[in-house]
UniProtKB/Swiss-Prot annotation:
The name this protein goes by in its record: Low molecular weight protein-tyrosine-phosphatase Wzb
Organism classification: Bacteria, Pseudomonadati, Pseudomonadota, Gammaproteobacteria, Enterobacterales
Protein purpose: Dephosphorylates Wzc. Required for the extracellular polysaccharide colanic acid synthesis, probably involved in the export of colanic acid from the cell to medium. Involved in protection of cells against contact-dependent growth inhibition (CDI), probably due to the loss of a physical impediment to cell-cell contact.
Changes seen on gene knockout: No phosphorylation of Wzc. Loss of mucoid colony phenotype, greatly increased susceptibility to contact-dependent growth inhibition (CDI).
Name of the gene this protein is made from: wzb
GO molecular function: protein tyrosine phosphatase activity
Length: 147
């Protein structure tokens, strides 16, 4: 059972906070948090990410970016990344995590979710669609696990 889930991207201001809140929407009983490999520590979510999420009735309010660490990783049963290279970086940092690190897009043909940072609103909207689809698929997989 995955009770503690960490979602990881680079800056922890666009993709991972959105994915975190989407998973929380589908599974409010789980502890879902996010962090970044190169986090903009202390920053809130990107304004465009906030706006796009709000269009889907998803709030990123109160988000505060934080840096991932080996120690932090130990607190989670499942760590979900946006890109395959993020898995590699996490496993270099903490080889013992290899068995619990997967792509956020795992159930969507191993889909990697591109970074929309400093890109157009349309890019943010497209990334939101990918995140929402993957979050739904994880929600279904997590439900199946509970049976």
């Amino acid at each position: 059972m995955f009770n503690n889930i960490l979602v990881v991207c680079v800056g922890n201001i666009c993709r991972s906070p959105t994915a975190e809140r989407l998973l929380q929407r589908y599974h409010p009983e789980l502890k879902v948090e996010s962090a970044g490999l190169g986090a903009l520590v202390g920053k809130g979510a990107d304004p465009t990410a906030i706006s796009v999420a709000a269009e889907h009735q998803l709030s990123l309010e109160g988000h505060c970016a934080r840096q991932i660490s080996r120690r932090l990783c130990r607190n989670y049963d499942l760590i979900l990344t946006m890109e395959k290279r993020h898995i590699e970086r996490l496993c270099e940092m903490a080889p013992e995590m290899r068995g619990k690190v997967m792509l956020f897009g795992h159930w969507d043909n191993e889909c990697e979710i591109p970074d929309p940072y400093r890109k157009s609103r349309e890019t943010f909207a497209a990334v939101y669609t990918l995140l929402e689809r993957s979050a739904r698929q994880w929600a279904q997989a997590l439900n199946a696990e509970q049976v």
